[in-house]
Each structure stands twice: as structure tokens, then as C-alpha cells.
Regions:
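Non-catalytic connector elements of ABC transporters
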Residues: 3, 251, 260-383
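ABC ATPase nucleotide-binding domains
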Residues: 45, 84-246
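The feature captures the beta-strand-to-loop junction immediately N-terminal to the Walker
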Residues: 49-51
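Helix-to-loop junction immediately C-terminal to a conserved catalytic motif
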Residues: 64
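Conserved coupling/switch loops of ABC nucleotide-binding domains, chiefly the family-specific signature
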Residues: 70-73, 123, 223, 255
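Conserved ABC transporter NBD signature motif
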Residues: 72-80
Length: 383
């Protein structure tokens, strides 16, 4: 669904709601967006995820029409809108600061885009009442933005963006100013509303939890390019790069060299200590310098009551730190303590009292293991 051949992708995906075809945007010599090609299915919730400066907001601004690409094309429902002004694209937009008119009531804020489109008063009144009911603000139509909570202001902005029935809703960090509890509640509400209205959403955020909670499709950007595109589960369980593995959540990255291939696409990787790791990936070749990604929750931890096994994916170490997460414990384990130059720290996540009813303490000797299908071989990032 992502490719460098923007022209062929545009033809193949003309039925999709949104197609970005080889978009570029520069500021002087700085490349903000470099050759982004992407197709987003109609009715899907697509999150563009990345750190500050990754180009995600620039992509959204080009899609909205607030910024013009240096080259490339933007299609919405098969129509080229690259050079159209924002008001002719029929897109709803919600920003982090909501951009509500402080001198207007809730009703007038929501009615504003309808009045700009020249609708009759009776139709405006009906659409506004219906939309305010949808966002559960039917009794707040006469209030002003300053009289509302942050969550209520966000709902007004959302109602204003949806009241004219846009083809696509664009959202730039819309929950960023809210506290964690309210943010979590509104994530659920927003996803439910998107499904109910069957609107295509493009949602920019740096928050991995928001992407995992709401998105049907996730785009991860870094340095102006797309690192990976897929479902949240695909990106979490099957990252293609070290950056994606780390950005989608905590992970252990263990360096090594591919030394062989086992059955079912499992690779054999040798760590500098001589320990063998088995992990998934069909694209790496023998001799490649790689990193193996293993999520902390996939690492089994038990007391080292017997000599360490020589089996692959079986390591010994000592607890360096133990942190309670409420329903679970996160352990930091130093592995390879007999060879200081090759020591690494690994993370493991276990239930409060461990799989065998034991809660581990700092400096306790432990054994770590994981399944080959829970580990993924990734190309080593250049340093």
C-alpha cells in the first residue's frame, strides 16, 4: 500500500478515499517531506504517527490545502485536489487548540461552516441540533467556549468539523491538551463516532497509545519519510525497522549476526557472547549485521535454580531494577555479567508475583527465555 512508484499506485488505488502520490515539501535545503506515497481506504481511521519533526503535520497541512507540495499529487475520492484551496476540498479539520471563536456561542461555532456555505436557516438549525446531540452537547448550545471544559471544547470543534458532512476529517493532535483520563475517554468516543458516521479520518499524533487504541491503519513517519504502514497490530508485532520497533512500544534490541536459517522462516542469529537467538524474518541473509527485537511482555522470567540452558533464546542474568506498574512488574535484567564489555540490559514484564508465584528482587539471579515466533530480526540501524 506504500510504494515509491506513486503513479502506478495512484492508478491501482483510485477507488480509495485518499491517495498521496510522491509528495515532497522543502523549506530551503531542509526536506520536511521526501517522496511520501500512501493510500487510505474510505471509512478508515488512519493515524500518522511520529516524533516531532518527522513530517507528519506537514503531510496533514498539504492534505488540508494549507501548504502546497513542491511536487506530487493529492487525490480524494479519485479527484486531484493538489492545487485546490482548502475551502474547495470539503474536509473537516480539528486542531489541538480547537480554534473556536471565543465571541460565538457553541451553536454559532457549529453553524459557522454551514452559514459560509449559504444554507437556509431552517436547515442550519436542524443540522446543528442533530450534531450537538451526536457529541452530547445538546444542552450547551447557548454557552461560550470559555464556559466549557477542555473536553467539551474538543467536542464543539469536532461537531463544527463534521456538521457539513465532509468526505474526510483531518485531526492534528486534537487530544494533546487534555489530561490522561479524559484523553482515554475521548479516544473511545471519537472512534465510536467515526464508525457511526463512516467518515474517513486522518489523525496526526506522537502518542503511540492513541494509535493503538483508535487506528485501523497506522503510518509511522521519521525524517520526512514513511518507515512502515499497516495495522497497529502489524506494526507492533512485525516491525520492519529498529525505529518502528522502538516507537511502537518498549522493546529489547539484541545485536548479532545471521549465521543460518531454520525451518518456517526462522533465522539463527549469533550474539557476540556466543549465545544463539532464533527469531522470525525471511528477508535477512546469512552474514547480515542485525538486531533482534523482543517485547518485554514476551520474555519469560524465572528464578535461576539450575544451570543455564544452552538452548537458543535462553539467557541468564541478574535483576538490576524492579518497578511496579500496578497490574504488572517491569524488570531490568543485566545479561552477560561475566563479560563486562558484552553486557546488555534487557526488560521483562510479568504479573505482580511472576509466573511461578515469585516476585523478584534486585540482584537476584534469573533465567530469561522467549519463543522464536515472538522475536523479530531487523536490519541494524546505521550509527
Amino acid at each position: 500500500m506504500v510504494g515509491s512508484d506513486g503513479r502506478s499506485m495512484m492508478i491501482a488505488n483510485a477507488g480509495n478515499s485518499i491517495v498521496l502520490d510522491n509528495l515532497w515539501k522543502t523549506y530551503g535545503s531542509f526536506v520536511a517531506v521526501g517522496g511520501v506515497s500512501l493510500s487510505i481506504e474510505a471509512g478508515k481511521f488512519c493515524t500518522i504517527l511520529g516524533p516531532s519533526g518527522s513530517g507528519k503535520t506537514t503531510v496533514l497541512m498539504m492534505l488540508a490545502g494549507f501548504s502546497e507540495p513542491l511536487r506530487g499529487n493529492i487525490l480524494i475520492d479519485g479527484n486531484d485536489v493538489t492545487r485546490l484551496p482548502p475551502q474547495k476540498r470539503n474536509l473537516g479539520v480539528v486542531f489541538q487548540n480547537y480554534a473556536l471563536f471565543p465571541h460565538m456561542t457553541v451553536f454559532d461555532n457549529v453553524a459557522f461552516p454551514l452559514r459560509m456555505r449559504g444554507l437556509h436557516t431552517a436547515e442550519i438549525n436542524l443540522k446543528c441540533r442533530q450534531m450537538l446531540d451526536v457529541v452530547e452537547l445538546g444542552g450547551f448550545s447557548g454557552r461560550y467556549p470559555k464556559e466549557l471544559s477542555g473536553g467539551q471544547q474538543q467536542r464543539v470543534a469536532l461537531a463544527r468539523a463534521l456538521v457539513f458532512e465532509p468526505r474526510v476529517l483531518l485531526m492534528d493532535e486534537p487530544l494533546g491538551a487534555l489530561d490522561k483520563r479524559l484523553r482515554a475517554a475521548l479516544q473511545v468516543e471519537l472512534k465510536a463516532l467515526q464508525r457511526r458516521m463512516n467518515v474517513t479520518v486522518v489523525y496526526v499524533t506522537h502518542d503511540q497509545e492513541e494509535a493503538l487504541t483508535m487506528a485501523d491503519q497506522v503510518v509511522i513517519m521519521n525524517h520526512g519519510k514513511i518507515e512502515q504502514f499497516g495495522t497497529a497490530d502489524e506494526l507492533y508485532d512485525q516491525p520492519m525497522t529498529e525505529f518502528v520497533a522502538g516507537f511502537m512500544g518498549d522493546t529489547n534490541l539484541i545485536e548479532g549476526v545471521v549465521t543460518g536459517r531454520a525451518a518456517d522462516g526462522i533465522l539463527r542469529v549469533e550474539h557476540p557472547t556466543g549465545r544463539t537467538i532464533l527469531a522470525q524474518n525471511s528477508s535477512s541473509a546469512i552474514g547480515d549485521q542485525v538486531s533482534v527485537s523482543v517485547r518485554p511482555e514476551c520474555v519469560s522470567i524465572e528464578a535461576a535454580t539450575a544451570p543455564i540452558s544452552e538452548e537458543p533464546n535462553s539467557w541468564s542474568g541478574r535483576i538490576a531494577n524492579a518497578v511496579s506498574l500496578g497490574d504488572a512488574m517491569r524488570y531490568t535484567i543485566v545479561v552477560g555479567e561475566n563479560r563486562p564489555s558484552l553486557q546488555i540490559e534487557m526488560q521483562a514484564k510479568a504479573s505482580r508475583r511472576g509466573a511461578h508465584g515469585h516476585r523478584f528482587s534486585p540482584d537476584e539471579a534469573v533465567r530469561l527465555s522467549w519463543n522464536a515466533n515472538d522475536a523479530r530480526v531487523l536490519p541494524r540501524r546505521k550509527k
